[in-house]
Amino acid sequence: MIRIAKESDLPAVAAVYEAILDHEDATGLHYTGWKRGAYPTADTARNIFNAGTLYVGVDEDGTVWGSMNLNGIQLPECKNGGWSIPAEDSQVAVIHTLTIHPDRAGQGLARQMVAFAEDTARSQGKTVMRFDTGVSNAVSNHLSPAIGYRFAGTVDTFFMGYVHCPLNLYEKKL
């Protein structure tokens, strides 16, 4: 099940962030561009929760297996990217920090999260879904076209002001 997060989910969301960073360290594949202690953190989860835009994927027993931030905020670098689907800011939904616990990878959960985000955005009157992902994030860059997203270009950014991170942009008409 995917639902809006509860405050009691926050430690589990932060634990998924850490599990992803641990997995990257263990495999040597640092595909997210994240930096431990800087982004994402428990404070990141709390801030997204406080904004009312944190969603979680949970098992029947309440175990959190993933999360995402779904809002309409585009990074300044991304806002003027190579978008081909015209839309006013109020018509755009954006997925940020979509996470799946590494132990649950390959089960179609990211697809479920994106489908949920699309349905939620449509119910809010949004007409376009956009998101960015690091150019080195092979999983996200492979999944995006497979679920109907169009590559809209690459932008250069210093993500969270700490790391050079070129981002691939994706969009889909809802």
What are these regions (language model features)?
Residues 14, 21-43:
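Conserved GNAT-fold acetyl-CoA-binding loop/helix
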Residues 1-15:
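A short beta-loop-alpha structural element at the N-terminal edge
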Residues 114, 121-133:
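Conserved GNAT acetyl-CoA-binding A-motif
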Residues 51-68:
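Conserved beta-hairpin
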